[in-house]
Amino acid sequence: MVASTVPGHAERTASPQLVNALRAAAEPLPAPENTAEFGACFDRFGDATVVMLGEATHGTSEFYRARAAITRHLIEHHGFNVIAVEADWPDAARIDNYVRHQAARPRRGDVFARFPTWMWRNVEVLEFADWLRDYNAPLIERRQVSFHGLDVYSLSESIHAVLAYLDGIDPDGAKRARHRYGCLTPWQDEPAQYGRAVLYDERAVCEDGVVAQLRDMLEHRLDYLRHDGDDWFDALQNARIVRAAERYYRIMYRGSTDSWNLRDRHMFDTLQALMGYRGAGTKAVVWAHNSHIGNAAATAMGWHGEFNIGELVRIAYGSEAALIGFGTDTGTVAAASDWGADMQIKTVQPARSDSYEHAFRRTGHARSLTDWRNGRNRELADLLRAPLLERAIGVVYRPETERSS
């Protein structure tokens, strides 16, 4: 659980006052399978510029269905036109081509092939993509809804994307890029090994080449834009990913805080680039884990020097940002026992008595929405300041040691 490092935290149970306040404020929700009815419960967030939808795990069907239902409603009734998810940019670009440009539906194994495959290669995401393709079909291009990845992990795929783009419009530029990216070639399939190599030999650093390549693409943007703006933007983002990924893997062995902050800063910068590229009036929905879309400054993460995309969005957009977390008590989850291991369906341990999830369970609501923004429920907001644990299940889940792992 992400808050297990709360300074001085001793096991405690949520106060009766907090449980009563939650029970009074909570609005019962229908099942997310009732898409229209469920989505309509989130009308209040339609005026936001950025709506961030979280999840307490990376493998719960209900979270994906709930986000899809909310997003559909925000698209249909409030003009949201960018979907940005905690996924690799090149894979999400394949989905974007499918939903906007009538490309063939990606085959199983063509996209989201990197561990953890189940995080985005699942029925719920496919059903949403099919719906989005149908929604976009009658619209002119500038009014269509786009689908993008925010993450930093696609070093190899992004290098190939930049080279493929330059091969088509600037062969000389492609030669320069191959030379600059050549330093990273030995590490493309196992980029974490690049960080280990740099740790022991600073001469292995590839920073100068990737920075020079990004600068080169920016300097030639007017020439490249004459061919196709969307293709140029895609290539530019891939060059930015190569730059960020090189640094991410280079510093990952120096400490988790620096690498975490770099990753979430890149996610925020990517979101900002998307907002700028789509132009005035752009409204975005972000799908990511609670640990990314929550306000890190209000949690143990912030106390240890970490920030996240949610905190950065809150700073940038203020009241025009809505951060919506998702919690769970019991059930099952798709997860692995170790990084790179096979997916398993695991039983989720009941929420600890000293957790927010346990407090919500005690309200008696199976599903509910609780909104305490803008001082509308000051008593509840004050009660929620009491330090409790918050569940955060990632792609690796070991139920027997959930808090410590």
Q: Where are each of the predicted segments found?
A:
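Structured catalytic-domain cores with a bias toward divalent-metal coordination
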Residues: 2-405
